[in-house]
Regions:
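Basic/aromatic recognition patch in beta-strand/loop cores that engages polyanionic ligands
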Residues: 49-81
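Amphipathic, hydrophobic secondary-structure cores in small proteins
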Residues: 22-36, 40, 60-64, 70-71
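Structural signal for well-ordered, non-membrane alpha-helices
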Residues: 20, 40-47
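Enriched for short, Lys/Arg-rich terminal
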Residues: 70-99
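Arg/Lys-rich, positively charged N-terminal/basic patches that mediate binding to nucleic acids
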Residues: 1-34
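GIY-YIG nuclease signature motif recognition
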Residues: 12, 39, 76
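Short, hydrophobic secondary-structure boundary micro-motifs
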Residues: 32, 54-56, 97
Length: 99
């Protein structure tokens, strides 16, 4: 297995900002920061043994989907030297329609 560079697209970064804002309103700044840090650490962990999750070629060629803590869905593709994270969906978002 090889390590790959992690790339978060602007849409994924915007998703993380939205998740932060949503949690910050409900639970406060510290809770929101800690949650985002856990999501980011999980995404960075896709650098090794990257070819995991469910393949969803029906939505986009090479697309993979993984869940995080039962509330977050991460969509990404694995390339030869990098993992490209497209979106990070929170809660019950209808992520299939967003891709």
């Amino acid at each position: 297995m090889k390590r790959r560079h992690i790339v978060l697209l602007p849409e994924a970064l915007a998703d993380l900002r939205w998740i932060y804002d949503t949690i910050e309103i409900a639970a406060g700044n510290v809770t929101a920061i800690r949650y985002i840090e856990r999501i980011e650490a999980y995404c960075q962990g896709l650098d090794y043994a990257s070819e995991r999750g469910t393949r969803r070629d029906d939505l986009r060629p090479g697309l993979r989907v993984v869940g995080f803590e039962r509330r977050v869905t991460v969509t990404f593709t694995v390339e030869s030297d990098q993992v490209v994270i497209f979106r990070v969906f929170y809660g019950g978002a209808n992520w299939e329609d967003e891709l």
